[in-house]
């Protein structure tokens, strides 16, 4: 995670090509990109940066999570989601998931994380993935309320 970044989100296609990105620095500068172009920049108040850190602090489970533990949906193709989160106490986590937005799709099947014990085809409830999405959505709501276009904060192609 870059030194002065408190939140960073990158959505790529299955081949790793960037679709959108939002990055929030410690000083409150927000940079938004779509398809590798800088398309929006704005400034947050310190209170909003602190709010983002506070949101992460409220979801402490994600700070102890590893990308290999995140449950994956049974989707052949799709997207990759990259998250950097920083809590109020300075703890940081960097996570990568495949198609994590599918936690919102009713009836979608999920398998255990890549290195979790158990059968590879064992269907599970995506508890860790849901916690990451919930944290992300709370931060996204704060950013949208402060002028960031929601198109930079999508979890899937759509």
Question: What annotation goes with each model-predicted range?
Answer:
Residues 18-37:
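Short, flexible N-terminal segments of the mature chain
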Residues 20-22, 40-42, 91-96:
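Short beta-strand segments
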Residues 47-73:
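Charged, amphipathic alpha-helical segments
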Residues 34, 56, 87-89:
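Generic secondary-structure microfeatures
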Residues 1-7, 11, 32-33, 38-50:
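Short N-terminal edge-element motif at the start of the domain
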Residues 1-14, 66-158:
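Short, well-ordered, aromatic-rich surface patches in folded extracellular/luminal domains
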Residues 25-30, 43, 102-105:
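Short, low-complexity, polar/charged sequence segments that are solvent-exposed and flexible
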């Amino acid at each position: 995670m870059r030194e002065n970044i408190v939140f960073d989100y990158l959505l790529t296609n299955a081949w790793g090509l960037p679709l959108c990105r939002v990055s929030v620095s410690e000083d409150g500068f927000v940079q938004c990109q779509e398809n590798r172009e800088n398309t929006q920049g704005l400034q947050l108040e310190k209170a909003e940066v602190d709010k983002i850190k506070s949101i992460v602090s409220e979801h402490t489970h994600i700070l102890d999570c590893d990308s290999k533990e995140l449950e994956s949906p049974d989707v052949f193709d799709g997207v990759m989601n990259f998250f950097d989160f920083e809590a109020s106490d300075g703890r940081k986590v960097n996570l990568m998931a495949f198609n994590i937005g599918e936690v919102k799709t009713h009836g979608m099947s999920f398998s255990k994380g890549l290195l979790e014990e158990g059968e590879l085809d064992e269907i599970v409830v995506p508890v860790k993935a849901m916690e990451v999405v919930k944290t992300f959505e709370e931060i996204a709501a704060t950013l949208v309320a402060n002028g960031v276009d929601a198109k930079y904060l999508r979890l899937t192609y759509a």
